[in-house]
Each structure stands twice: as structure tokens, then as C-alpha cells.
A protein has these predicted regions:
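Extracytoplasmic, non-cytosolic globular domains
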Residues: 388, 396, 400, 409, ...
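Catalytic His-Asp segment of secreted/periplasmic serine-dependent ester chemistry enzymes
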Residues: 154-235, 452-529
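Bacterial N-terminal signal peptides
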Residues: 8-21
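Structural recognition of the beta-strand scaffold that forms the well-ordered cores
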Residues: 36-39, 62-66, 92-97, 149-153, ...
């Protein structure tokens, strides 16, 4: 071996040794573990915990201590079964409430718990003095776990059709609990005040145990907010939050199939999002939908709210289509596109209007004769928008009034229920003007999504599409209204095999069609933004 080769090898070995030391000295990136939070309470917290867990996914692992069918949880059985309720897991935070089960009237002198009306000889499960004693014992044992604690006040009790509750009896017990928690330095999640603002306390009882029903009003927002605050996980957003509103019929709602709501499942049919990201011919273009672990990704810089068959809010991801667990519509790629281009926090309000006709259901105020009322869907649209904007902090716990919001864009996907193109054009022009007035945004960027169902060979909607394009081309709409062509996204192969697929009204539930549609909408919206 020559000297030059010998010295070269020595140099290489020395270089590798130095690099190894440098690499070894480089600190490994530490990923903070996701905190575990347990919710203890009666049955009203079961669904609320599920809702809250959906919003907190990726930030907090939230679990409800499950109950047996027919179980009425109160301070007595909570003390008796506390070890089982806590389980073997280490909890960073415990959110707890017991109250309704203590206030209910029960049959006396029975080993098994049975609800019995006061008028039939029932006795209140727990006296005020015993309630305080039990609470103090519970707090002592819960504090011994080393977990942080949050107490939730008991929700309001209104009329009970079966006489098993006394209206407003929770007020005394909430005062007792507040005193105990203050002595122990335990923060209180004021569920009582939250619910009191939402429900009609004078409404006659509609159920046997009316205090367990809340007129479909969401209970989860204060749970989410109190958990994040106690764990110091509130993330201030860059405002004002840019709000984009989406409205329309089935093509807007979307039915793009996702087989597995957690992680794409291999070997699925063409047209599913699972197939698209794993095995489709352009799969590499869709891999950004997955996180490093191969699960469906969410993005916290884009929020979304959709209220169809129940409200759902959170970080943008799958599950905001027609099936709230396993579907997508155009909102997914629309939001992704916006998030990639807008530095401020983005929020999508996806409205649910059924399958409206623009000319009748969405008729706006300035159309028609004097005194004619707007269409039902138009009124409902404004109601959904305003209710969503008024409760942004409930839906998105990182939102603050200091950040504020501004309505930044509107997407309309309506036309499949309309046949008269002349009337359609007239109503569309009026709708744009009226919505801008009602939303107090005179130059609101507006996207008209072309009625592309049926593709290029369709003979039903060309006149509607022409009317849409004519409205977009009006001088007053230049630079602030745009048209999105969707016929090229029609799944022709699914249409040819229609006997194997769902209705064409839902675009054969083809996920790629909805994804491409949303991407095109997003691209056009970006061009309209200042």
C-alpha cells in the first residue's frame, strides 16, 4: 500500500470519528407526550367527552370513565368504585362532576338503586350535608393521585315530567361544591352557566329525566377550554381569523368514501380515498394527506365547522363530508389549499342546507315582489353563519376576541335542483349582492362552483352552467367573483359501471372527484384574495 493511500485512509477514519462525536453530541429531538385526561361524571358527559376528544385529538387523550347501562352515578358509588374508575393509567388531569345522581329521588330502603318520584315516596339520594362530606372525601382521594383536577358545576335542572327532580335544587349543591373546591384550590368549569345560556328553562319536560337533555345544545365547549387552560395548551392564533363559508347541495356536502377513519386501509376499491393515497396511479400526489405514522393528517392552521346531523368542529381533516366519520367533500382540499397560501388562521364554516334550489329555497330578499319573504334555505344559511361566528370560541378553543375574524370568501355550489336558466341567472346575481349586504362585506370574494354533475356528456345542466358563467362575467363581478369548472372531475368510469355504485347525485361517492373539485375551488379563491 502506498503512503498516500495509507494517509488517505487514516484521514477518512479520523473524519468519521469526528463526525460520529458530533452526531452523538447532537441532542435528539424530544416529542412531548400527549397528556392523558379522565372525565368522571354521569351520563351527560359521555357524548360530550366524545365531542371534546374529537376536537382535542393530537393534543390531549381524553377518556370518559364508562358506565354500566342504567347506572346512576353519584358521590356514593363514585367513592365506592373510585379505584375502578381511575384504572391503572396515569392521569395528567381529572375533570369531574357528581350532582344529578345525588339530587334524583330514589326508592328508600333498597340495596339496588331505583329512581322513584317524590310523590310516590321517593327520597333524595344525598342530603346536602352528606353531599359535602362525600365531596371532601372524593377530593382527598383524587388529589392523592397527583393529577391536576377540574371540578365541573352541576348543570341546571328544569321541569321533570316524572317528578324525580326538584327544579333548581342544584343551586344549593353547586354552592357547597364551590366552597369545597375553593378551599382545595381546585378550578371550576362552570357548566351550570354555560348550559343556562343555551336552554329554555321554562320549556316543559319532554323526557322522563329532563335534566339529562339539553335541546341538542353542545355541552363540550367548556370542557375543551378548561382542559386546555389547565394543561397550559392554549395556542394563540394569528388573526384576524380568515373565515370562508361554503354552501350548496349534495355536490357541496360530499360523499367521497373513506374506508378507515384513522388510517387508510390497503386493498380498497378505486374511488375511495384509501385507494387514492396508497395504490392510485397518482398516489404520490396524495401522500401529504398522511402523517409520518401513515394516519390521516389534520392541520391546526385550518379550522372547520359542519353541522349536519349534529355539530362537528375541529382541525381540518377527513370526516366533514356527508358521513361525519368517513367521508370527504370539497372542503378537505379547499382548506388545504387555503392553508398553504394564507399565513393567518383559516376557518371554514360548511353549512348544511339539504338540497336547495337557488330560485325557490335560496331566494334572496331583493328578488320577487314587495313583501315576499326570502327562501327558507336563505334564512337558514344566515342563521347558521351568524350562530357559528357568534360562538367561534366555543368551537375553537384557541380563538380569542383579541384575534378577531373577518369573512374572507364565499363558495356556492347550487344548481342541480334548478331548471330555468334565465331565472337562475337573475337569482344568482341577486344572491351575491344580498349576501354581501347581509354579511357586511361589499367586495366579498365569491366562487360559483359549476354544476358539473354528469360530466362533459351531460345534457341536463349546460344552460345552468352558461347562466353561472354569464353572471361571473358581469362588469361588477370582475376580480371578485370566479367560476370553477367541475365537469372534468366527473368519474366517468364509475358512471359507466353505475349499477355497482351509489346514486350519480352523489358523484358516485368518488373521493377523487371531491378532492379535485375542492383543489380547483381553492386555487380560484386564492386568485380573488387581496
Amino acid at each position: 500500500m502506498s503512503n498516500s493511500i495509507h494517509f488517505s485512509l487514516i484521514a477518512i477514519f479520523l473524519l468519521l470519528a469526528v463526525c460520529s462525536d458530533v452526531l452523538a453530541a447532537e441532542p435528539a429531538s424530544v416529542v412531548a407526550p400527549i397528556p392523558n385526561v379522565l372525565v368522571l361524571g354521569d351520563s351527560i358527559y359521555s357524548q360530550s367527552t366524545n365531542n371534546a376528544a374529537s376536537i382535542l385529538r393530537g393534543r390531549v387523550n381524553l377518556k370518559f370513565a364508562t358506565m354500566q347501562p342504567g347506572e346512576v352515578r353519584n358521590t356514593h358509588n363514585a367513592l365506592e368504585n373510585l379505584n375502578d374508575l381511575l384504572g391503572d393509567e396515569r392521569w395528567d388531569l381529572i375533570h369531574f362532576n357528581f350532582g344529578l345522581g345525588d339530587l334524583v329521588y330514589r326508592a328508600p330502603n333498597m340495596k339496588t338503586f331505583r329512581v322513584l318520584p317524590k310523590t310516590a315516596g321517593g327520597i333524595r339520594t344525598t342530603s346536602p350535608a352528606l353531599y359535602e362530606k362525600n365531596l371532601r372525601a372524593l377530593v382527598t382521594r383524587l388529589k392523592a393521585t397527583g393529577s391536576k383536577l377540574i371540578w365541573a358545576s352541576t348543570t341546571p335542572i328544569r321541569h321533570s315530567s316524572t317528578g324525580v327532580f326538584d327544579m333548581a335544587s342544584e343551586i344549593e349543591y353547586n354552592a357547597i361544591a364551590a366552597r369545597v373546591m375553593m378551599e382545595h384550590g381546585i378550578p371550576v368549569n362552570d357548566m351550570y352557566s354555560h348550559v343556562l345560556k343555551l336552554i329554555d328553562m321554562e320549556k316543559p319536560a319532554a323526557h322522563g329525566a329532563d335534566p339529562f337533555y339539553f335541546d341538542r345544545k353542545p355541552l363540550y365547549p367548556p370542557i375543551v377550554l378548561s382542559v386546555l387552560r389547565q394543561l397550559d395548551l392554549i395556542r394563540p392564533v394569528r388573526g384576524p381569523v380568515q373565515v370562508f363559508i361554503m354552501a350548496g347541495g349534495w355536490s357541496h356536502i360530499g360523499g367521497g368514501i373513506v374506508i378507515d377513519s384513522v388510517q387508510p386501509r390497503p386493498g380498497q376499491n378505486r374511488g375511495t380515498l384509501d385507494h387514492l393515497v396508497l395504490e392510485g396511479k397518482n398516489a404520490v400526489e396524495y401522500r401529504h394527506l398522511l402523517d409520518q405514522g401513515g394516519k390521516w393528517k389534520t392541520r391546526s392552521d385550518v379550522w372547520i365547522h359542519f353541522d349536519r346531523r349534529g355539530p362537528k368542529s375541529g382541525a381540518l381533516g377527513i370526516g366533514y363530508g356527508g358521513d361525519r366519520k368517513r367521508c370527504i367533500g370539497s372542503e378537505l382540499s379547499f382548506g388545504i389549499t387555503l392553508g398553504e397560501h394564507i399565513e393567518k388562521q383559516v376557518c371554514i364554516i360548511k353549512t348544511a342546507l339539504g338540497t336547495p334550489s337557488l330560485v325557490s329555497d335560496l331566494r334572496s330578499p331583493s328578488v320577487g315582489g314587495h313583501g315576499q319573504q326570502p327562501g327558507t334555505a336563505y334564512t337558514n344559511l344566515l342563521k347558521q353563519i351568524n350562530e357559528s361566528l357568534d360562538s367561534l370560541s366555543d368551537k375553537f378553543p384557541d380563538y380569542t376576541d383579541d384575534a378577531g375574524f373577518e369573512i374572507a370568501g364565499f363558495v356556492l355550489n347550487v344548481g342541480e335542483q334548478d331548471g330555468d336558466s334565465d331565472l337562475y341567472g337573475e337569482h344568482l346575481k341577486a344572491l351575491i349582492a344580498d349576501l354581501r349586504t347581509d354579511l357586511k362585506t361589499p367586495q366579498l370574494p365569491f366562487i360559483i362552483v359549476g354544476t358539473g354533475r354528469g360530466g362533459r356528456d351531460d345534457t341536463e345542466f349546460p344552460s345552468i352552467i352558461q347562466a353561472q358563467q354569464q353572471v361571473v362575467s358581469l362588469p361588477e363581478h370582475q376580480g371578485n367573483v370566479a367560476f370553477v369548472e367541475t365537469r372534468d372531475f366527473w368519474p366517468n368510469k364509475d358512471a359507466r359501471d353505475a349499477y355497482r355504485h351509489p346514486s350519480n347525485e352523489r358523484w358516485f361517492d368518488n373521493a377523487e372527484s371531491f378532492y379535485l373539485m375542492g383543489k380547483a375551488i381553492g386555487d380560484q379563491m386564492i386568485k380573488l384574495l387581496p
